[in-house]
Amino acid sequence: MHDFGSTVLCCTPSYSLYLADAIKDSGLPREEFKLKIGAFGAEPWTENMRNEIEEKLGIKAYDIYGLSEIAGPGVGYECECQHGTHLNEDHYFPEIINPNTLEPAAPGETGELVFTHLTKEGMPLLRYRTKDLTALHYDKCTCGRTLVRMDRILGRSDDMLIIRGVNVFPTQIESVILEMEEFEPHYLLIVDRKNNTDTMEL
């Protein structure tokens, strides 16, 4: 990035923090890097992680959404207003369903994201369950675009932990960790059952 004068970084959010640490360890001044913006996806990340990326790399961080079964990267992007990810609904029909009942969710209600191909000719998918948990918003964005907006991915329906009857998503824990300066954004959750009681160790 330094030698080529790269201005855009595309990777996972966690790898961008690794790169930020590598830049710091290299001894090269951050000001010598020409990075301006980053497009990050492929894993859930929080607003706190966005703030940390922007602070450590001195860039503007944008969310990008995609999955290989639908089209790879580029199913949706954040706009400059960053009020959600605009989905390219001229190519895909997005829906939110309750992951347990499979019934459609109300606009703005969190549930599992489902896609149907509209323009793919070879092997189109119908109501493909992504396992990603989010919500959709249909009001016009302040940027002027009218494409449906998707909230940041909360987690996956198959990643959700139920501990003592409480639904726990790893991204919720990450959000709290990143508010504490003494912690790095790398963590391990150990969930166990002791004496018939669920326990979680961080």
Task: Report residues per predicted region.
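Active-site glycine/GP-rich loop and adjacent strand/helix microenvironment
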Residues: 1-202
